[in-house]
Each structure stands twice: as structure tokens, then as C-alpha cells.
């Protein structure tokens, strides 16, 4: 397997008082966060807490309602060409062969580098096949190659392994970790799998009701051995916080739920 040519150091990120609202609903509330260049950060939390919204803001797919996103002293939007986002679905075009999916949107002489990145993810021999011939894990490898060919400094991962079987998921985790160590880009991984977050990240963020409720450093050597006592203890710490949030957070959650139910009842009465 060949090595992809050097990718520049990762993008540093600063969030200053970031908020995001959809109508009257606040999804992200006054986020303050600094991520150093090349750091691997995992973001966990309950469904609807704002994890994926955060990634969309960082990718430039949506604008924040409040605050500023920075990369160093410049706006993060200036680094948009160096940012790539991977989704849970590989989103390959079925009418284009694997190599053409990797080079999608590129001009000039890109095919040699496309073959190189496919080799990096272990799929050089599938370059001229159709996506329909690939397994779910192989499709995600193609999606990863499609991101790598752009030489990203910031890689955003929105549950990219969530639909894979357990063994394929472990293999993909190892591949992502090796590529990150080799090339030094900054990674933000959104995942519902706390064990995955602990195994891969330098740092785990827990988002609760649109705010950062926990910021936990994972100061363990790599490669990390699954099932180790230290990993299990960290996983238990995060899970306990996810399942048993502080009283203020839970009261806020119940208040929002009651408010929504009250609004729905009022609408039914009015009708």
C-alpha cells in the first residue's frame, strides 16, 4: 500500500459565542471552544443535541445565528477549500466508476493521484468497478479517498461508520486513525458510539441542550487496546454523564418537552 503525499498540518479552530437557531428553537447556545491544529476530537450526545448542526456550521453548509468561527486569525470560511465532510452514507454516484467518484469535480490530470488515494484506503484494484459492486465498508473507503484527494486540513466525520457491521467498523476506525496520524489533519468525529469516541479521540466533547457539558481529554497512548481498564473507565464516565445529566439540564429538557406538548395541545384546541 503506497503512502499519500504529504498533507499540510491541520486547521486550528476557534468558536466564539457560537449560537444556532431555527425559528424559536435554539440548537446551539453560546459555544466557546478551541481546537488545536491536528487534534482528533469526538463529539457525542443524545439525538437532537446539536452535534450534526455543529459539523454543518464548521463545513460552511449553514451559517451561525450568533458568534464567529475562526481558523487562526482568519474566518474559518476562508479555509473551506481545505475542509471535507463525510456522512453516514457514502453518497457515491452509481453511474460513475469508483475512480471517477474519487475525482469528482476535479480538473486536469488527477487520475494518477486518484489511484494513489485508492491504494491508500486499500481499493486500488477496484478503481474501474461500479459502486454497486462494493460493500458498505468499501463504499465508505471510496468516500474517504474522495476526501483525501483534496488534501484536507480539516476532516469532519458525521457518523460515517454508523451503518457498518462491527468488524468492518473496527477496520475503518483503524484506517482513519492511521491516516490521521500520518497526515496530521484536524478531525471532528460525531458519533453515538461512546466506545468509538474514547478509542479514537484525543478529546471527547459531550453536547447537552446545545452547550458543551463535558470536555474530556483522552490522554492514553496509541494504539489503544479495546477492553482495557482505562478505556472502560473513561467510557463509563462519559456514558454516566450522557444518561444522568445534571439536574439543571434534565429540568431544561423536561421543560422544553412540556412546552412542545402544551403548544401541540393548544393547536388541537384551536382547531
Swiss-Prot record:
Q: Which SMART domains match?
A: AAA (SM00382)
The protein's Enzyme Commission number = 7.6.2.14
Q: Where is the protein localized?
A: Cell inner membrane
Q: Where is this region: Disordered?
A: 250-271
Mode of membrane association: Peripheral membrane protein
What are its GO cellular component terms?
A: plasma membrane
Q: What is the protein's known function? A: Part of the ABC transporter complex SsuABC involved in aliphatic sulfonates import. Responsible for energy coupling to the transport system.
The record describes its quaternary structure and partners as: The complex is composed of two ATP-binding proteins (SsuB), two transmembrane proteins (SsuC) and a solute-binding protein (SsuA).
UniProt family annotation: Belongs to the ABC transporter superfamily. Aliphatic sulfonates importer (TC 3.A.1.17.2) family.
Q: What is this protein called?
A: Aliphatic sulfonates import ATP-binding protein SsuB
User: What species is this protein from?
Assistant: Yersinia pestis
Its lineage reads: Bacteria, Pseudomonadati, Pseudomonadota, Gammaproteobacteria, Enterobacterales
Gene that encodes the chain: ssuB
Amino acid at each position: 500500500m503506497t503512502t499519500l503525499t504529504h498533507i499540510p498540518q491541520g486547521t486550528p479552530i476557534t468558536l466564539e459565542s457560537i449560537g444556532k437557531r431555527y425559528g424559536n428553537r435554539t440548537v446551539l447556545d453560546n459555544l466557546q471552544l478551541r481546537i488545536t491544529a491536528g487534534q482528533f476530537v469526538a463529539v457525542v450526545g443524545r439525538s437532537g443535541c446539536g452535534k450534526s448542526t455543529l459539523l454543518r456550521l464548521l463545513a460552511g453548509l449553514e451559517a451561525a445565528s450568533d458568534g464567529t468561527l475562526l481558523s487562526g486569525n482568519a474566518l474559518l470560511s476562508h479555509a473551506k477549500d481545505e475542509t471535507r465532510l463525510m456522512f453516514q452514507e457514502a453518497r457515491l454516484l452509481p453511474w460513475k466508476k469508483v475512480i471517477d467518484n474519487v475525482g469528482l469535480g476535479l480538473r486536469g490530470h488527477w487520475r494518477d493521484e486518484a489511484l494513489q488515494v485508492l491504494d491508500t484506503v486499500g481499493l486500488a484494484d477496484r478503481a474501474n468497478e461500479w459502486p454497486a459492486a462494493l460493500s458498505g465498508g468499501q463504499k465508505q473507503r471510496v468516500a474517504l479517498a474522495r476526501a483525501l484527494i483534496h488534501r484536507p486540513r480539516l476532516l469532519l466525520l458525521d457518523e460515517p461508520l454508523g451503518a457498518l457491521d462491527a468488524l468492518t467498523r473496527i477496520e475503518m476506525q483503524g484506517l482513519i486513525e492511521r491516516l490521521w496520524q500520518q497526515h496530521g489533519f484536524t478531525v471532528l468525529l460525531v458519533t453515538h458510539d461512546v466506545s468509538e469516541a474514547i478509542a479514537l479521540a484525543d478529546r471527547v466533547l459531550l453536547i447537552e441542550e446545545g452547550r458543551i457539558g463535558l470536555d474530556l481529554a483522552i490522554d492514553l497512548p496509541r494504539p489503544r487496546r479495546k477492553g482495557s481498564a482505562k478505556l472502560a473507565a473513561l467510557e463509563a464516565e462519559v456514558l454516566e454523564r450522557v444518561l444522568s445529566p445534571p439536574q439543571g439540564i434534565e429540568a431544561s429538557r423536561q421543560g422544553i418537552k412540556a412546552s412542545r406538548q402544551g403548544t401541540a395541545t393548544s393547536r388541537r384546541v384551536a382547531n
